[in-house]
Design a protein with these regions (language model features):
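Flexible coil/loop and intrinsically disordered segments
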Residues: 1-145
Length: 145
């Protein structure tokens, strides 16, 4: 449930409003959406499901949200945030059959020195999130634009 909430908060609230306090940020999102209509809720559910499907289509159910540049078997919160945030901005048609190029770009991103530095300390710091998004989005735009 918290991961779903994280997806919505990071997609619909300004990252600049995030003060490195995840609980407060998620609470603020919940408060601002406590009166959503059933139609709005259905739309949000659809967005989440479609975005997750795009991630799984590209990386596979067993590999999605795992750092493919390492041998770690666990899914990573920072990759969940990064991929769900970025894939929500593109349609299935834009992603198309570019899975191999996207996987290669993610591997390059995960090996990037700046990206690796953004993972030191608390992974979900605003500065780290911004750094990772910038590095990843530069590579993804080349493929999907």
């Amino acid at each position: 449930e918290e991961l779903v909430l994280l997806f919505f908060a990071f997609n619909f609230m300004e990252l600049d409003d995030y003060e490195d306090n995840m609980s407060k940020y998620l609470d603020d999102y919940m408060i601002s959406h406590q009166n959503d209509t059933p139609e709005q809720i259905a739309s949000l559910k659809n967005l989440f499901t479609e975005t997750l499907d795009k991630c799984v289509d590209v990386f596979g159910r067993d590999s999605v949200f795992k750092n493919i540049s390492t041998h770690r078997k666990r899914q990573s919160l920072y990759l969940y945030d990064l991929l769900m945030w970025s894939f929500s901005q593109y349609t299935k048609e834009q992603i198309g059959n570019k899975q191999d190029a996207i996987k290669q770009a993610l591997q390059e991103t995960c090996n990037d020195i700046g990206f690796k530095k953004s993972l030191s300390g608390r992974v979900m710091r605003k500065s780290g999130i911004k750094t990772r998004r910038t590095i990843w989005e530069e590579k993804l735009k080349v493929i999907l634009s």
